[in-house]
Amino acid sequence: MKNFKVIQMRVLLPVLLLSLVAANIWAADPPVEITKKDRCPVCGMFVYKYPKWVALIVFQDGGYYFYDGAKDMFKHLFNTAKYTPGRSAETIKEIYVTDYYDVELIDAKTAFYVIGSDVLGPMGHELLPFKDRESAQEFLEDHKGKSILRFQEVTPAIIESLDRRQ
């Protein structure tokens, strides 16, 4: 009987761990796929042309908007009613940005953003998102970045300063 419990644990534990990992991976998938019709509500550009720069906001009612960079996503976030009348920032469910190195959507609220670098996005000077501080620091050093910000540190004034650099 004791051997049976050991065998059960040796089989069930890996299956359980694999299930948890798979559930975590599936939970990280974006809720919608980008199409050729999706346009940035801030600048009007077709977003599918810029996969390295895509950002995404999903609302509680399932509505969503893609952006051609984190900068336009923040502009929308700071003035939701202007870019999407009838919506408010309080009804946002999820926000994603694309990790610059991995080109995968990541949670915008946990990302690290490099500003002031020599790399330009589709709309000029951009915030470049990274999933971890180490990657952001490496990029900052390689591309003459000025600083690394967290989501809550990005302000309308910072976004305006990026636009003025153009």
Give the ranges of each region predicted by the language model.
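N-terminal targeting pre-sequences for secretion and organelle import
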Residues: K144-Q166
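General N-terminal leader/first-domain-start detector
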Residues: M1-K2, A136
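Sec/Tat signal peptide C-region and signal peptidase I cleavage site
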Residues: A23-A27
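N-terminal secretory signal peptides
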Residues: A28-G86
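Acidic helix-start/capping segments at beta-turn-to-alpha-helix junctions
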Residues: F59-Q60, I95, P156-A157
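Bacterial N-terminal signal peptides that target proteins for export
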Residues: K2-L13
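Bacterial N-terminal signal peptides
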Residues: L12-A22
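Thiol/selenol-based redox catalytic cores and closely related redox-interacting motifs
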Residues: S88-Q152
